Amino acid sequence: MKKTSTFQNGLIWFGAGVSLAEILTGTAFAPLGMAKGFAAILLGHIIGCAMMLLAGLIGGRTGRSAMETVKMSFGQKGGLLFAFLNVLQLVGWTAIMIYDGALAVGGIFAIGRWVWCLVIGALIIVWIAVGVTDLGWINKITMAALFILTLVLCKVIFFSGNAMVGIDGESLTFGAAVELAVAMPLSWLPLISDYTRDAEKPTQATWVSVLVYGAVSCWMYVIGMGAAIFTGEYDIAVIMVKAGLGIAALIILVFSTVTTTFLDAWSAGISAESLSAKLNGKKTAIAVTVIGTAAAILFPMDDITGFLYLIGSVFAPMIAVQIADHFILHRDRFAVTADARNLVIWLVGFIAYRLLMGVDTPVGYTLPDMVLTVVLCLLAEKAKPTKQM
């Protein structure tokens, strides 16, 4: 298979970062104010991207897909649980991204949300048909256009002479805000190895991918937060219309949705291959896009906060177990059917995350939950009998 360059990987993750979902999530930070909100965004991304980096390095070192690396900690059958949960997550993300994109574009060109769902879905299928290693010039042109247009959007929001608009109350605590910032890179964590494994220089590609994604994602969050604070407007499409962006707004909204959602659908196909060797990744990715498009047409998906927290509770303890096994204990359970010990530790981590959601910590829930999970892995290893579980 043709290998991807470090530059190509950077472009892929630039496209992932330029996302309407990130901008919309950023608007929720407005009650904190610019300084406190930016601190929460930065801290959350440092935590989330550190985990994303370690997940990518595992895939890069081993040459395995994201869900195949999970089997190194949870065994062949144990890994299937996370492959299944990841496919569900990615179907959900595909639907949410298409819904958000269609809703936003519909605010500019009102020809019906379902029409824009179909247009965006069709473009994603074109991206899938071309394939991740052959996007080449398409990606370069698209990313250049998105970069220029997001700069224009920044100018409209931050340099149009608008005074700060008063935001009532502080409905979001700092800890909850940090967690919302962690959630985006965390949601990409079960995907990154699907791309780093095909890189010419896996370690270099992983670092570049994470740094590019982290920087761009922070930028999108700040655009959303700034839009709410400086314009008092939470609908990014309305801001674009008021700024007279017109066709430029259409390009930003449609192609940012396509370049991000393509990765969701593509990785859903790769994860499905971990579930069954009979499944074809590309065909499954197209099927996921069709399902996501249908769901976006049929169901409302305006509040994704609960979905983001659910992703955190599933995948934070999962990667914590992987980090402990790969980087500290040097333990590989790929050959076993299921690693009961690690599955129990993951379940404890999952429950702990849900309980931590009721506690407001300055660093959110993910970091304490991961520390707890890693400590449990180390204690379990120390306490194990001579014969391994």
Language-model features, listed with the residues they occupy:
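Membrane-interface loop-to-helix entry segments
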Residues: 115-157, 168-169, 206-213, 308-320, ...
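Membrane-interface "cap" regions at the ends of multi-pass membrane proteins
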Residues: 1-36, 134, 173-178, 190, ...
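Membrane-water interface regions at transmembrane-helix termini and the short interhelical loops
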Residues: 27-31, 57, 96, 100-108, ...
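Juxtamembrane transmembrane-helix boundary signature
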Residues: 42-74, 81-87, 381-386
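Hydrophobic transmembrane alpha-helices that form the core helical bundles
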Residues: 78-111, 258-274, 317
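Transmembrane alpha-helical segments of multi-pass small-molecule transport proteins
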Residues: 12-17, 82-87, 108-131, 144-154, ...
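Extracellular loop-to-transmembrane helix junctions
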Residues: 27-57, 78, 213-215, 368, ...
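C-terminal membrane-solvent junction of multi-pass transporters and transport-like membrane proteins
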Residues: 3, 169, 320-389
